[in-house]
Amino acid sequence: MKEPSERLIDMLGHPYNQRNVQALLQSFGVKHMPPPNSYFNDDIIWSVKTSIRIDIYRAPKINDLTGRKYTNQDGWIIGAIHFLAPGSDDRIKAPFPGKLPNGITMSATPDESIKAYGQPELYEECWWPGFSGRILAWRKPGINIAIEYADSEVDRVMRSYTACLIGCIGAWRDDNPDIFAP
């Protein structure tokens, strides 16, 4: 049987249904998932209890961003799933408690992630105000995966695992279009 994280990632490109997502996360104690609440073409749905962020888009916007046709209806489509750990956002107090795809967890090292997913298409050391670390990213059929590691005093710590339909890092489309543009 698939892990909840894998089943959630399988929802990418499908309409956001708060009841289905809640049922999937029920084993983590989630009793309610909020509906979309945005006047714009995108919204963020948080499940702080499970350290998950879901990016959703109106169908015309995700169709335009990806160059694909996910649906003709003007509903909300899941475009990205973020499994988070402390340091990724002020709301997040504990790492995502479940297993991630390919058997890794939020405690996986960069080498363990590379072993699980193969050589990344993007392997970047980053230093910007308030952050230093490493970003690993893979392009798989129909999905992009990005794992961000923050430098700590002793090691590198995973602070986010993102699976998305479009560039999981906004700049990918401009910086590495040969790899990550739709």
Go through each PLM region and give its residues:
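A cross-family detector of function-defining hotspots
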Residues: E3-P4, H14-D89, K99-P182
